[in-house]
């Protein structure tokens, strides 16, 4: 090699080493339930985050910088969520994907907003979350105020029950959804016989089942999560009830079928569309399956989209406030399709679908 070639090679090596020296890791806090009764939804979130970060980094990351996931467990518990949020602050992380449950997301968001940390939640649906004038809170899912009307419309137009009961778990997510469904059913002059709450964590629902039978209830909407829904379904069917049940995406988990068995067949659920069935997402589905993980969960995809949204913002600025401004003013291409946000941080035009849940843990479009 002549001197000119050696000089050129040396220059290329120096440039490469220089780029490596300046490349840095961008830490992203991914917060969800790794323990507790709804840890299955945390599994979905972390599956989506892990795959999104791997795919983003494989394509060069953010201007050569790699995203690094730092996992935190809030167990969907408000007090633990606050402790986690404070740890995120102390760890010096500026970007959060999470939390999952509305009841834990809201108190954590207070801390993030005060500390200038961007939070994109892939699952919290409570309208109150983005109704407080915060600048750094966004989401990649819809609202209870979207999901409730979708459920009520289907109940009134398709199911047409005569006597309806609405039951919830007394938590922000479940009760908020239940009230949204109730309000919309009343607008349609549907007969809501009773609206009542159970306690999350209960396993004996014989009193509720007896009341459903006594009141001749032919349709139940349940606002809450899968552990209680699974028990209610199993016990209702064991008592001979033919009542139709419906719930939100919080019950749409394969663990529901593990609890309820064949009693889960025919449950109606509202949830985001089946993004794992979108042809363009097949390479991601295959990559997740290759790791023996499940790509079907709704929060796999809303989390993946949250990371894509964060990446789009980071390509413009590393300032959380500037990222939030950018996302609210632009559209981002994601696995969910193009996403855009309003001034509050809510998605524009997000739609929930209605699905038939099956005993094998899958969901198909409801007729």
From Swiss-Prot:
List, in alphabetical order, the GO biological process terms annotated in this UniProt record: amino acid transport
SUPFAM superfamilies the UniProt entry points to: Periplasmic binding protein-like I
Instruction: Quote the InterPro entries the UniProt record gives.
Output: Leu-bd (IPR028081), Leu_Ile_Val-bd (IPR000709), Peripla_BP_I (IPR028082)
- Is Disulfide bond among this UniProt entry's keywords? yes
Q: Where in the sequence is the signal peptide annotated?
A: 1-23
Please give the positions of the paired cysteines in each disulfide bond: 76-101
Tell me the compartments it is located in.
Periplasm
- Which GO CC terms are listed, alphabetically? periplasmic space
What does the UniProt keyword field contain?
A: Amino-acid transport, Disulfide bond, Periplasm, Signal, Transport
Say which family it is in. Answer: Belongs to the leucine-binding protein family.
Q: What does this protein do?
A: This protein is a component of the leucine, isoleucine, valine, (threonine) transport system, which is one of the two periplasmic binding protein-dependent transport systems of the high-affinity transport of the branched-chain amino acids.
The name on file for this protein is: Leu/Ile/Val-binding protein
Naturally occurring in which organism (per UniProt): Citrobacter freundii
The encoding gene is: livJ
């Amino acid at each position: 090699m002549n001197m000119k070639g050696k000089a050129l090679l040396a220059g290329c090596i120096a440039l490469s080493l220089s780029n490596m020296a300046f490349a840095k890791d961008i830490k992203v806090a991914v917060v969800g339930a790794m323990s507790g009764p709804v840890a299955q939804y945390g599994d979905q979130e972390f599956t989506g985050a892990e795959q999104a970060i791997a795919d983003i980094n494989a394509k060069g990351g953010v201007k050569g910088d790699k995203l690094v996931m730092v996992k935190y467990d809030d167990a969907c518990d408000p007090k633990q969520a606050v402790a986690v949020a404070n740890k995120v602050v102390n760890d010096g992380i500026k970007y959060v994907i999470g939390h999952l449950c509305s009841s834990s997301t809201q108190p954590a968001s207070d801390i993030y907003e005060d500390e200038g940390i961007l939070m994109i939640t892939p699952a919290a649906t409570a309208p109150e979350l983005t109704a407080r004038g915060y600048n750094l809170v966004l989401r990649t899912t819809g609202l209870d105020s979207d999901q409730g009307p979708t459920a009520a419309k289907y109940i009134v137009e398709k199911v047409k029950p005569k006597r309806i009961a609405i039951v919830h778990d007394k938590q922000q997510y479940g009760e908020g959804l239940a009230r949204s469904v109730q309000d919309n059913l009343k607008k349609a002059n549907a007969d809501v016989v009773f609206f009542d709450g159970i306690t999350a964590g209960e396993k004996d629902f014989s009193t509720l089942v007896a009341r459903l039978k006594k009141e001749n209830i032919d349709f139940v909407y349940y606002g809450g999560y899968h552990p209680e829904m699974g028990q209610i379904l199993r016990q209702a069917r064991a008592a001979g009830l033919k009542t139709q049940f419906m719930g939100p995406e919080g019950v749409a988990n394969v663990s529901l079928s593990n609890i309820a068995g064949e009693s889960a067949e025919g449950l109606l659920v509202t949830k985001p569309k089946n993004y794992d069935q979108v042809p363009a997402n097949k390479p991601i589905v295959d990559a997740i399956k290759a790791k023996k993980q499940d790509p079907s969960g709704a929060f796999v995809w809303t989390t993946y989209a949250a990371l894509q949204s964060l990446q789009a913002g980071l390509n413009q600025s590393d300032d959380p406030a500037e990222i939030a401004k950018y996302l609210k003013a632009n559209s981002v291409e994601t696995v969910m399709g193009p996403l855009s946000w309003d001034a509050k941080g809510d998605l524009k035009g997000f739609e929930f679908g209605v699905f038939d849940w099956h005993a094998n843990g899958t969901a198909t479009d409801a007729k």
